Amino acid sequence: MVRKVKRRVSCLPKATYYKPREIPLCDLEIINLSVEELEAIRLCDLLQIAQDEAADQMGISRKTFWNDLQKARQKVADALVNGKAIQISGGDYVNSGVCKVEFLCQKCNHLWETPCNEKRPENCPKCGSESIYRKGGDGRGKRHTERGFCCPKHGDRAVGDQEESV
């Protein structure tokens, strides 16, 4: 019997439960979305990464990635259309922790990345300026930047079209 490959997941969700408003939890059917199914949606739909690249990031075949993505989309659609709660839990995954955040120095235009789980840098590593900004439009998808946050773990504001200090 073939042993299931653990999928690599970059960012764990901050919220793990979603339910329709104004419907008591006791009246709701709950759909379980695994962490790796959520990661497939995040990579393909939110970050708009090609499926073959997303499969490589998760350490699985394209077919397995496609199957996970289809299952996840079906579960989310079922919950939204039929008013069900979504619980994100379980799965067979390894936290790879490769979520990155890009920063841009306003003084020297130096661009660099930091891991998501590290403290926000205080100054530019190249020139030492404190005029640094979280760079928007970093491949995380338009909706992601419009929401204004890079990710739940980092919690830093993104700079999209308008220049906002972080």
Curated annotation (Swiss-Prot):
Q: Which InterPro entries match?
A: UPF0251, WH-like_DNA-bd_sf
Name the Pfam families for this protein: DUF134
Q: Which domain of life is it from?
A: Archaea
Which family is annotated? Belongs to the UPF0251 family.
Its recorded name reads UPF0251 protein UNCMA_27150
What species does this protein belong to?
Methanocella arvoryzae (strain DSM 22066 / NBRC 105507 / MRE50)
The organism's lineage? Archaea, Methanobacteriati, Methanobacteriota, Stenosarchaea group, Methanomicrobia
